[in-house]
Amino acid sequence: MCLRVLDLRIPKVIITYCPKCRTHTEHSVTIYKHGKRRSLSEGERRYARKKKGYGSKRKPEQKRFAKVTKKTVLKLKCSKCGYIIHREGIRLKKAELVEVGGR
């Protein structure tokens, strides 16, 4: 298993399949960013309840190998219908969106 971490240049526009249009169309590419955490959501309240009180941590402390980077998720927006697809990428230190010339 190779644990090589990359820097990747991703084109701003790609042609790929749109499940809503059912054809291959141009998609604009952006990098997905997670939203703000809501402190009153059910999961957040459950987490706070479990964490409350004295004693140990909620989960055991990790002893061995931990991940160094997160997987980059790409948001592909169809230029025809505006449908957005999330596409999971690979582990990257840095993903850079670049303008591809040619046409």
Curated annotation (Swiss-Prot):
Which UniProt keyword terms apply here?
Metal-binding, Ribonucleoprotein, Ribosomal protein, RNA-binding, rRNA-binding, Zinc, Zinc-finger
Choose any GO biological process term that the UniProt entry carries and state it: translation
What InterPro entries does the record point to?
Ribosomal_eL44, Ribosomal_LSU_eL42, Ribosomal_zn-bd
- Biased amino acid composition, Basic residues: 47-57
Q: Which GO terms describe its cellular component?
A: ribonucleoprotein complex; ribosome
> Which stretches of sequence are listed as region Disordered?
40-62
What is the protein's known function? Answer: Binds to the 23S rRNA.
Q: Which family does it belong to?
A: Belongs to the eukaryotic ribosomal protein eL42 family.
Tell me the protein's name.
Answer: Large ribosomal subunit protein eL42
Q: Which gene encodes it?
A: rpl44e
